Every structure is written in structure tokens, then in C-alpha cells.
Swiss-Prot record:
Keywords: Dipeptidase, Hydrolase, Manganese, Metal-binding, Metalloprotease, Protease. GO terms for molecular function: aminopeptidase activity; metal ion binding; metalloexopeptidase activity; phosphoric triester hydrolase activity; proline dipeptidase activity. It catalyses: Xaa-L-Pro dipeptide + H2O = an L-alpha-amino acid + L-proline. Its cofactor is Mn(2+). Mn(2+) 2 binds at residues 246, 257, 421. Its EC number is 3.4.13.9. Binds 2 manganese ions per subunit. Mn(2+) 1 binds at residues 257, 337, 382, 421. Transmembrane segments: none annotated. This is Xaa-Pro dipeptidase.
Length: 440
């Protein structure tokens, strides 16, 4: 048995235990988990790229096959209903042959409606987990997406199994390879479009396999937080200032989410990247079990305020910068989020398995995690420092604008901004930085 198989066996045991617990709590007999269905483009005969239900891929890495089902009760061997139609128009999924196949009772469907032949007699006592409620109703499944079940599963998804951690390590190893190729491509004078091609070639995944749309931003485009335009226009060397890439990789359904920023030449912006990089590594060292993630985010704002002071961008005290929202202008997003089956993984606001919600602080509305940090959790840590026109203009017109060095801000605007993002695991004996240990 391979090491991956051994890790997967333990992973499945954990999922079975969680399933037993929530079924007992809710008086249910089982979960019918639907991989999903394709969505037809309006007034067209083509479908959008298929994206699998994350509740389905938690159990096994079947990521590209709609109309599959899992029937799980936490006790018996999980039943996988695997869709293999007779179809000469499209590629049919290969027969399962991977490290996970022995852990499932695999049955085949040639038509989606054949799932009805495999449902248990007491299907009214089974919950449906999936995005097609009309299918659940048609099949007579009892409860569609019960909130108590989803809350329980989402809360516990924050605690990664050894198998999940190995998938995330591999996603970082491969992702780092792509980031290095992207940097080399930028330094060779490539366009955003060409850089993205270099990244995808290095990691061996196309746009449909990637966990999210790659952000490949040259110069001012780095000030657009979710920039995915991918300009094919090459920028002349004399007008080339900076490059930000935020891109990940999918391994068995688990995502890496990595960001780096590079300067075209030495100078003040390169020094600013180095300074923020140092602050990012130091804030990672402050991750401890029992500390709330929102406290870490606030501490990062203190660090950023001191950096704004040291670089003479803002002439205010640290507390004043934070209290008046000046640091939010330069760092408007959250410090990070849970990472796993989804890039912004589930459970970031849940305080218990019942789903008790703790919103982001009013001062930091875009923070995606308010959980207490615990062993086994995986986060991104991604501080930023940006020069965003739509945020800088209100600051310039306000009272605090008098304390900003606008000459320096104007000199840095063409660079867009900086983001540095690592993926980290909290262990009992410290933090494992999956990204740095992969060589980036």
C-alpha cells in the first residue's frame, strides 16, 4: 500500500466518524452527496466549465465528472455511483484506477436518472448535499442541504487530515515551480498573457483546472486586487516597473494560493517589497494556538503603520493611522483565510459546530476569518501595500490627507502595489510554511 493510500485510509476514517456524529445528532440515516451537473450557457448549446461540489471532493479526488454520487452513512463502505455514459461527442471519464478506488463500492451509471435505482428504501431519511435541489426533490430525498449538517461539516473542515496536508504540500511544491517560471518570464520581457502561459506550462494545469483565475498584473494593474484581464500587450523595458502574480494549483481537489511581487529594477519599490516580506514572515511567527485570527490581522495593521512611518509615506502615529482608517487605504483586504478544498475554505466565521457566526470587525469588513487559531488549521497570510486610486482620492481630500507624503505616493503609483502570500499550517510545535519550504 502506498503512503498516499495509507494517508487516504486515515482521511476516510475521519470523514466516516464526522458523518456518524452528525447523522446521530440529526436523526438521519445517511448523506447523498451529488458531484453536480453541468450548467448550460444561456441561449447556447455549450456548457460552462464544470466545477465539482466541494462536499463531494472532500471524499475523493473525482473533480471533472458530473452526475456522480456518494452514498455515505458513516458505517458501511461508501458507495460511489460513477457516471460513464455512452457518448461519442465528449470524452467519457476513465475507469477509476487510483490510490482511492479500493475504499469505495463503485457502481456505474450510464444515464443520470439511474441513480434512483441505487438509493436506499429509506431515502426520506437521507439528506441531499448538492447544488441541484430539483434533483433531490425528483428523487424523493428527505432533506436538501440541512443547515445543521452543513455547519457541522464546514466547521470541522478547518481541521485538516494528514492526507489533506500532503495534498496542500504538493499544491505548493507545484505552484512554486509556476511562480518561478512566471518571474523568469516577466524578467524576459513577456506580456501578462505570455507570463500566464509560462505559469500554466510549468504547473501542468490550464485555466479550467486552476483553483481560481490567475492574477498576473504588471505595473498599475497590481493595484486591482482581483485583476484577471491578462493583457497580451508587451510593456517596453523603460516602462516596466513591477509584477504581481497571485496564482495557485489544484492537487486532488486541494488548492494552493500563493502571491509574490517583483520589481523590474532596484530602487525604492524593491526595498518596499523586501520590507513587507520581512513583516510578513514576522507576523507568521506570531501565529499561536488559542489566538484569534482577527487579532493577528489587527497586529498586521500595526506593522503596516510602522512601515508607512519608516518609509515616510505617512506622518501619523500608529494608533492614529489605524483609528482613522488610513492603514485600510493602503491595505484594504484581510490578512488571509482558511485554505483547503476551496481557496476561501469554509468555516472561517464559525465559532462552533452549530455554526455560530462571528462577523469580521466593523473596522475590517473584508477579513475572511474570525476563528480562534488551532492545531491542524491551514491559513493564507497575505499582507499587502497598494496605491489604489479610488481609495487614495478620498484620503487626499480628507483631514488625514494633510499627513500623507503625496510626492512619494505619486512616485509609487505606477508600481500598483505589493502582496506577499504564503500558505501555512499550525502545528502543536510551531508553524509549517508550505510555500517557503517549497523554495519561494
Amino acid at each position: 500500500m502506498s503512503s498516499y493510500s495509507q494517508l487516504f485510509a486515515q482521511h476516510l476514517d475521519t470523514l466516516q466518524q464526522r458523518t456518524r456524529d452528525i447523522l446521530q445528532q440529526q436523526g438521519l440515516s445517511g448523506l447523498a452527496i451529488h458531484s453536480g451537473q453541468t450548467h448550460r450557457i444561456f441561449l447556447d448549446d455549450q456548457d460552462y466549465p464544470f466545477k465539482v461540489n466541494p462536499q463531494f471532493k472532500a471524499w475523493l479526488p473525482v473533480l471533472d465528472n458530473p452526475h456522480c454520487w456518494l452514498l455515505v452513512d458513516g458505517v458501511n463502505k461508501p458507495v460511489l455511483l460513477f457516471y460513464r455514459p455512452v457518448d461519442f461527442w465528449h470524452k467519457v471519464a476513465e475507469l477509476p484506477n487510483a490510490f482511492w478506488v479500493d475504499f469505495f463500492d463503485i457502481r456505474f451509471l450510464t444515464r443520470p436518472e439511474q441513480v434512483a435505482d441505487h438509493l436506499p428504501a429509506n431515502k426520506q431519511e437521507w439528506a441531499y448535499l448538492g447544488g441541484h435541489l430539483e434533483v433531490a426533490e425528483l428523487l424523493g430525498l428527505g432533506q436538501p442541504n440541512p443547515e445543521a449538517v452543513l455547519n457541522y461539516l464546514h466547521y470541522h473542515r478547518a481541521y485538516k487530515t494528514a492526507y489533506e496536508l500532503e495534498c496542500l504540500r504538493d499544491a505548493n511544491r507545484i505552484g512554486v515551480r509556476g511562480h518561478i517560471a512566471a518571474k523568469d518570464s516577466f524578467m524576459a520581457g513577456a506580456s501578462e498573457f505570455e507570463i500566464n502561459l509560462a505559469y500554466m506550462k510549468a504547473v501542468g494545469q490550464g485555466a479550467n483546472e486552476a483553483p481560481y483565475g490567475n492574477i498576473v498584473a504588471i505595473n498599475r494593474n497590481a493595484a486591482i486586487l482581483h485583476y484577471t484581464h491578462l493583457s497580451a500587450q508587451r510593456v517596453p523595458d523603460a516602462e516596466r516597473y513591477s509584477f504581481l502574480i497571485d496564482a495557485g494549483v489544484d492537487v486532488h481537489g486541494y488548492a494552493s494560493d500563493i502571491t509574490r511581487t517583483w520589481a523590474w529594477r532596484r530602487g525604492e519599490f524593491a526595498d518596499l517589497i523586501a520590507a513587507l516580506d520581512a513583516q510578513q514572515q514576522e507576523i507568521i511567527e506570531e501565529i499561536k494556538p488559542g489566538r484569534r485570527y482577527s487579532e493577528l490581522h489587527l497586529q498586521m495593521h500595526h506593522r503596516l503603520a510602522r512601515l508607512l512611518q519608516a518609509t515616510e509615506l505617512v506622518d501619523m502615529s500608529v494608533d492614529e493611522m489605524i483609528h482613522t482608517g488610513v492603514t485600510n487605504v493602503f491595505f484594504p483586504h484581510g490578512l488571509g483565510h482558511f485554505l483547503g478544498l476551496q481557496v476561501h475554505d469554509a468555516g472561517g466565521f464559525m465559532q462552533d459546530e452549530r455554526g455560530t457566526h462571528l462577523s469580521a470587525p466593523e473596522q475590517f469588513p473584508y477579513l475572511r476569518c474570525t476563528r480562534v487559531m488551532e492545531v491542524g488549521q491551514v491559513f493564507t497570510i497575505e499582507p499587502g501595500l497598494y496605491f489604489i486610486d479610488s481609495l487614495l482620492e478620498p484620503l487626499r481630500l480628507g483631514e488625514q490627507g494633510k499627513r500623507v507624503n503625496w510626492n512619494k505616493v505619486e512616485a509609487l503609483r505606477p508600481y500598483g502595489g505589493i502582496r506577499i502570500e504564503d500558505n501555512v499550517v499550525l502545528h502543536a510545535n510551531g508553524v509549517e510554511n508550505l510555500t517557503r519550504q517549497a523554495g519561494l
